[in-house]
Amino acid sequence: NKPEELDKKDLKVQISINQKNSTESRSLGFRFRNSFMPDSINNIDLALSQMSYILTPEERKELKKLKQSDKENFFKKAWARRDPKPDTKINELMDEYYARVAFTEENFSRGTAGGWRSDMGMIFILFGKPDDIQRYSSMQSNYSYETWYYFSIGQEFAFIDDYGFGDYRLRYPFVY
């Protein structure tokens, strides 16, 4: 396995003792992972790609120049800068961010496209669960649309599914 994928690998240790005509075996399963990453992350390249919505332009430039061996360190430092409570062992913001990514993968994935890459996924990752959702569908045509409301920040986002396949796109571009 590649080292960047080993951090979540399910492993098993088996010990066998041969004594005279008898063999006794015991096994123990465990999971090895990096303590600075949430449980949902098992690939550093994917985790860094999923950070694209919050990376600064300078961080993006730096990331493009990195060797594979330097990516975990970049990940740690980028999240350390964003840690709302650096005195604790847990980075609450990182955990929430990747919980949202996991939600988008579960709810907004279409075909081979990851849910986090979808327009709905991007908005959900950046702003969380909407305060309210209005859904509309047209019986005469195939299109449907949804409007997500975020009252606390005074934002609303309209998504349109032009063809009725569940592929909702932002009606108006959003620059993050």
Set out the residue ranges of the language-model regions.
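Poly-acidic low-complexity segments
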Residues: N1-K2, S16
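Short, aromatic- and glycine-rich surface loops/edge beta-strands on solvent-exposed regions
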Residues: D7-N21
